[in-house]
């Protein structure tokens, strides 16, 4: 599944690299992945909305899952309604246009001043399609508010549960539409 993709390295011996092979034509046929847009539990979505409404300094962290889900338009609509700033992971670059008023830029080890400052002060982190890698979280030093809570929107159960979050497990596009 695209939510479980990761780094791949193929190491082939030099003699294998120089060989030719008659590949069957079927190997090159176009394949289309149909993504099932898993929806989250309605009660969990209601709870997430309550947390967002009560939050004084929320921050959205947009990860690569935004792109896998094709949810950039839904993210834009969501931030226009909620007025929540957005920081992007390396894989989430381009989730919002660079000149969007909600755009803070990169977060984490090589993050922008604004994104890093706001992540330290935020009382609510809304992770959408992020794995919260050490590069993104600056080894967890990015979130310094002692009362910070997390809402994680992610197809992958493991990533949705990180940081003791309110797990909103499902497809980012489907969830942001709700």
Language-model segments: which ranges?
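Glycine-rich beta-alpha junction loops
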Residues: 12-18, 64-66, 157
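Short, well-ordered secondary-structure micro-motifs
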Residues: 20-23, 71-72, 99, 163
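Glycine-rich, acidic loop regions that bind phosphate or pyrophosphate groups
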Residues: 92-178
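Conformationally flexible catalytic loops at phosphate/diphosphate-handling active centers
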Residues: 1-54
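Short internal beta-strands
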Residues: 11, 83-90, 151-154
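Short, solvent-exposed amphipathic alpha-helical segments in soluble enzyme
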Residues: 25-27, 71-83, 140-145, 166-167
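Anionic-ligand anchoring segments at beta-strand to alpha-helix junctions in alpha/beta enzyme folds, i.e.
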Residues: 40, 47-125
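Flexible, glycine/proline-enriched loop segments at strand-loop-helix junctions
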Residues: 34-37, 61-65, 166-167
């Amino acid at each position: 599944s695209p939510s479980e993709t990761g780094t791949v390295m193929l190491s082939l011996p030099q003699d294998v690299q120089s060989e030719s092979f008659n590949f069957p034509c079927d190997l090159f046929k176009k394949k289309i992945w149909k993504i099932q847009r898993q929806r989250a539990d309605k009660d969990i979505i209601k709870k997430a909305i309550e947390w967002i409404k009560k939050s004084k300094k929320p921050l959205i962290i947009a990860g690569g899952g935004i792109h896998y889900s094709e949810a950039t338009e839904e993210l834009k609509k969501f931030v226009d309604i909620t007025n929540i700033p957005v920081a992007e992971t390396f894989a989430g670059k381009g989730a919002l246009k660079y000149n969007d008023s909600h755009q803070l830029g990169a977060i984490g080890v090589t993050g922008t001043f604004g994104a890093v400052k706001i992540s330290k002060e935020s009382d609510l982190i809304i992770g959408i399609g992020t794995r919260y890698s050490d590069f993104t979280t600056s080894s967890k030093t990015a979130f310094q508010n002692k009362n910070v809570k997390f809402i994680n929107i992610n197809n992958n159960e493991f990533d949705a549960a990180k940081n003791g979050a309110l797990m909103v497990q499902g497809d980012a596009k489907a969830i942001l539409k709700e």
